[in-house]
Structure formats: structure tokens, C-alpha cells
Design a protein with these regions (language model features):
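RNA pseudouridine synthases
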Residues: 2-310
Length: 310
């Protein structure tokens, strides 16, 4: 595995890390401030730059709970040649793949040559660094969905990922703010999905012919009379799966102008891919990446401290 300026994963050599052992119950931000004698702003910068792992898991959460015996690693690398783009932030990179956090408003890959996309951003970034590679799309997020994505840097790795996706990617989760008060703490939604002639995906309890079976698991985190915060785990990865399935149970995602009910309190689709866990396609190493829940989602609820239950 390559060690370059953007790596923040568990394969860093010890010389490129400050390795710290947790001695008492605390939070990650407070631990960094005290253990490394950092200012609060400097500690936040390091976390935001994806330079910290807890027990080999990348995290950016200020309030990540820490327990005695856990190991925190802080990268000594000062990131250079950093990608500066409002839509794409590199979370992890090695010679085989790159993990990004995509913001809403940009395509994962272009449908036509002139469309701006995360793939184009990465290809331009590689070219500026004189890397002889391109970003190969192995899965997608909708334009208006934000969150974690992975791109292969070679045809070889892309093929491994595409042929073994469900064996390699073992935990992919989303957070969504949806309309209405959820009736259940959790459940599973199953149906057949198929596009109609207008390219709108519709759901059916039986295969309409040419449909694709889809399974979505959900867990309610917070609920009010107006909105609910829901964690979603995909067992299948179909086009528009989450959006259609939440519509199916009467709780469409807020800000969804295609499958929603018109409720758009923050001016965007309230769907974010916050967790991506997989086995490295070349080394087999367990790779774990998570982002905080979007703050604008949390502001819809009284308790704005809800975070991923890691």
C-alpha cells in the first residue's frame, strides 16, 4: 500500500504517526488538546483533515467517545498537494483507490461529456500531480446525495471491486431526515424496483418483469411530529432505492423533489452516506470510514448532538 500525502489509514508507518493510548474516559477533541498540548482550533483542524484514527478507524468526530486502552493515532504528515474543491474532499488515498466525501450538488460521474462530476475533479487532481491514473467509478451517489464514495485508480482494482462488491463492502450506511413521525423503531423494506418510460423508479411487491429486488433496513434515531432522523443500511444497491423505499412507507426524504411530498426545510435532499466499511481489494485490510451527521440535518431536531452510533 502506498504511503502518500493524503493517506490517513492504518497502514502508515509508525514514524509517520504520533501513537497515543487513552488512559481515562474522555472525548476525542479533549484528548487531543490535552495529550498533544494543542489549541482547540488546531485540534479541530487535524480532525477535519482526516488525520486521526481511533483503533485503526478513521474519524472526524469531535465528540467521539474514548475509553481506556484505545489507541489514537495522529498523522505527522503535513498534507501537501491537497485537493481544494468545494464539492470533493479526499478522505483517504493509496496507489489503488481513493475515498472521498462528496457534497450535494455534483454528479458522481458525468452522463454527458460536458457535465461536471466528482470523477472529473479527481481526474484533474491526478493530472496536476502527474499521476498516471484516472478515477474509475465503482458505485454512485445521486447528485443531491452527499457522503462517502470510493473510486478505483486502475481497471484492475475497478474490476475486483465490481465483481466482488457485496463481499468487499460489508457496511454502508446512510443518515436521512424524513417527513413525519416514524411509527416504528426499525424495520426492513423489500420490493421490486423498475424505471418507467419517464425514468422514474417505481416500487412493486412483485416483479413487474425486468425489475430488481431491493432490501433496505432502517432504524429510527429521533422523531418529532414533523420530522424523523433515520439510519439506513442497504442490503442491495439499486438506483434511487432509499428514496423510493422511504416514499413506500409514507416517510419520504425531506427535500426530495422527485419522490418527496414537497417538504424542503433546508433547501437540499436530506440524505447523506456517512459510513463506508470495506476490505481493501488488494491487501484485504479492513478499512473503516465515517463522517459526522450533517449539522443541518440535526438542526431540525431539538437535540443537535446526535451522532453516529459507532
Amino acid at each position: 500500500m502506498s504511503n502518500n500525502h493524503n493517506m490517513t489509514g492504518a497502514e502508515y508507518a509508525a514514524s509517520k504517526y504520533n501513537e497515543l493510548t487513552v488512559r481515562e474516559e474522555t472525548t476525542l477533541l479533549e484528548f487531543l488538546i490535552k495529550a498533544m498540548n494543542l489549541s482547540r482550533n488546531r485540534a479541530k483542524d487535524i480532525l477535519s483533515g482526516h488525520g486521526v484514527t481511533v483503533d485503526r478507524r478513521n474519524t472526524t468526530r469531535y465528540d467521539e467517545p474514548l475509553h481506556p486502552g484505545q489507541v489514537v493515532r495522529v498523522s505527522k504528515h503535513k498534507q501537501s498537494n491537497q485537493l481544494l474543491n468545494r464539492y470533493v474532499k479526499i478522505v483517504y488515498e493509496d496507489k489503488d483507490l481513493v475515498v472521498i466525501e462528496k457534497s450535494e450538488g455534483i454528479l458522481s460521474m458525468p452522463a454527458t461529456a460536458k457535465q461536471y462530476s466528482a470523477k472529473q475533479v479527481l481526474d484533474e487532481y491526478f493530472a496536476k500531480r502527474h499521476f498516471k491514473c484516472t478515477a474509475h467509478t465503482v458505485h454512485r451517489l445521486d447528485r443531491e446525495t452527499s457522503g462517502l464514495m470510493m473510486y478505483a485508480k486502475s481497471i484492475e482494482i475497478a474490476k475486483i471491486l465490481e465483481d466482488n462488491w457485496h463481499d468487499i463492502v460489508f457496511d454502508r450506511r446512510y443518515i436521512a431526515a424524513v417527513s413525519g413521525e416514524m411509527e416504528h423503531e426499525g424495520g426492513t423494506i423489500e420490493s421490486w424496483l423498475k424505471d418507467n418510460k419517464a425514468y422514474v423508479t417505481y416500487s412493486s411487491p412483485e416483479d413487474p418483469g425486468g425489475g430488481k429486488y431491493a432490501i433496505t433496513h432502517y432504524h429510527t434515531l429521533k422523531t418529532t411530529a414533523r420530522y424523523s432522523l433515520v439510519e439506513l443500511k442497504l442490503e442491495t444497491g439499486r438506483k434511487n432505492q432509499i428514496r423510493v423505499h422511504m416514499q413506500d412507507i409514507g416517510h419520504p426524504i425531506l427535500g426530495d423533489n422527485k419522490y418527496g411530498n414537497g417538504s424542503d426545510p433546508i433547501g437540499r435532499l436530506c440524505l447523506h452516506a456517512y459510513r463506508l466499511h470495506f476490505y481493501h481489494p488488494r491487501t484485504g485490510e479492513v478499512m473503516r470510514f465515517e463522517t459526522p451527521y450533517p449539522r443541518e440535518f440535526l438542526k431540525l431536531f431539538n437535540n443537535a448532538t446526535t451522532e453516529p452510533n459507532s
